[in-house]
Curated annotation (Swiss-Prot):
GO terms for cellular component: cytosol. The alpha subunit is responsible for the aldol cleavage of indoleglycerol phosphate to indole and glyceraldehyde 3-phosphate. This is Tryptophan synthase alpha chain. Its EC number is 4.2.1.20. The keyword Amino-acid biosynthesis applies. The active site is at E49 (proton acceptor), D60 (proton acceptor).
Length: 270
């Protein structure tokens, strides 16, 4: 049983969903990035989705693009990202850790070499933002060889054959999009079509986790009530960093408040 399965199995009897924050490694600095991640885990986060900074993050809106720029300004690189990841895994042994990145970073490092490095660090899953499932065979092959769980994005308008492929090959969780487009902060409650949720649940036991625009506790409560296992929240965290990165104490206080309130919202109230 992988860490995602263990997490969901632990939460279901208590009628809780999982809260997975997304943070760009190195934002706003290497040291502060670690402090933010630790504060999230210690105050409610059930798992982590961590971004490797990239110069052209095409799936991301302005807020996450700025987070990538701040990370590059902190002199982050892939090897420093691996060091941060090793430190997080050493401190937090049981929490699921996923990476979100772009395919060119893996190509440049070497596909097998990258997955092997992630396995040695203790990474659970990898989601490649610009990789359609139809073109994923080589990446899936090396993920499986190196005991890394591949994760794929399922858009709300996915066709039948795409849904089936995602259900077969997405192993850590299935990343359900709230909407088409790029990442960002939203005030609306956007839940993927119930027909899509039910179709995926018939095809697989892999947890369904929703992301893109999940920004407030009231949204999270509705999402969990719809039968989705959890949420990924990134832009709202990156916006806090953007607003308070020059005041470390204030930033950590805001992160702690967010983590506690978002986790509380995953508890189903009937």
């Amino acid at each position: 049983m992988n860490r995602y399965q263990k997490l969901c199995k632990k939460l279901i009897p208590f009628k809780k969903g999982c809260f997975i924050p997304f943070v760009v490694l190195g934002d706003p600095s290497i040291d502060m990035s670690l402090k933010i991640i630790n504060a999230l885990i210690e105050n409610g986060a059930d798992g982590l989705e961590l971004g490797i900074p990239f110069s052209d993050p095409i799936a991301d809106g302005e807020i996450i693009q700025k987070a990538n720029l701040r990370a590059f300004n902190s002199k982050i690189n892939l090897h420093k990202c691996f060091d941060i990841l090793s430190e997080i895994r050493e401190k937090h042994q049981t929490i699921p850790i996923g990476l979100l990145l772009y395919s060119n970073l893996i190509f440049k490092f070497g596909i097998n070499k990258f997955y092997l490095k992630c396995y040695k660090i203790g990474i659970d899953s990898i989601l490649i933002a610009d990789l359609p499932i139809e073109e994923s065979y080589v990446f899936r092959k090396y993920a499986v060889i190196n005991n890394i769980l591949p994760v794929f994005i399922c858009p709300p308008d996915a066709k039948k054959n795409v849904i089936k492929n995602i259900a077969i090959h997405s192993q850590g969780y299935i990343y359900l999009l709230s909407r088409s487009g790029v990442t960002g902060i939203n005030q609306e409650i956007m839940i993927p079509p119930l027909s899509l949720i039910n179709k995926l649940k018939k095809l697989t036991k892999t947890p369904l986790i929703q992301g893109f625009g999940v920004s407030y506790p009231y949204q999270i409560q509705k999402i969990i009530l719809s039968g989705i296992s959890g949420v990924i929240c990134g832009s709202i965290i990156a916006k806090l960093i953007e607003n308070y990165f020059q005041d470390d104490d204030k930033l950590i206080k805001e992160i702690i408040f967010l983590s506690k309130s978002f986790k509380k919202a995953t508890i189903i109230i009937e």
